A protein has these predicted regions:
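Conserved catalytic core of the tyrosine transesterase superfamily
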Residues: 1-168
């Protein structure tokens, strides 16, 4: 449903850990500054991540439908946030529905966020801050994934040589 689509979109759109998504409060969404506040993430540090315009639209649709109070993604009793276990289970169901055969978890969304930013040319130090990593070494794990993609890219030189060979 819309609730989980919104929650998974927050995880990917902001590079959040599952526990960070489940513990978001409505007040953590700052639509004026287009930021999401992560309160006491891993390492007991607060940080901000970007709030994309498309994510804001999705969150507003979700808010209008669900009318959450307090927690952005409340649990069944609405007093507590959705549990990380429930979030993980819903992710598994969504992956089965999408017929994703690869072994993935909500953390894959965070990994994809970092990898896609890196592949898009975002400085690794910016990615480090967005992910809330204390050490750059932790963030460099994502460069290994990006290197696989780099190998698949055709060099402009090869494209030029092919074009010249075809014109010859």
């Amino acid at each position: 449903g819309l609730r989980y689509r919104a929650a998974f979109s927050v995880a990917y759109g902001g590079g959040l850990r599952a526990s960070e998504v489940t513990h978001l409060k409505i007040g953590d969404i700052d639509s004026d500054r287009m930021l999401i506040r992560i309160d006491q993430g891993k390492g007991r540090k607060d940080r901000h991540v970007m709030l994309s315009p498309s994510l804001l639209v999705l969150l507003r649709d979700y808010y209008r439908e669900a009318r959450p109070a307090g927690w952005l993604f409340p649990g069944r009793n609405r007093v507590d946030p959705i549990s990380t276990r429930q979030f993980n289970r819903a992710f598994g169901v969504a992956c089965d529905f999408a017929e994703i055969k690869k072994r993935v978890s909500p953390h894959t969304l965070r990994h994809s966020f970092a990898t896609h930013l890196l592949e898009g040319g975002t400085d690794i130090r910016v990615i480090q801050v967005l992910l809330g990593h204390a050490k750059l070494e932790t963030t460099t794990i994502y460069t290994k994934v990006a290197i696989k993609t780099i190998r698949d890219v055709t060099s402009p030189l090869d494209l030029l040589v092919r074009r010249e060979a075809g014109a010859g």
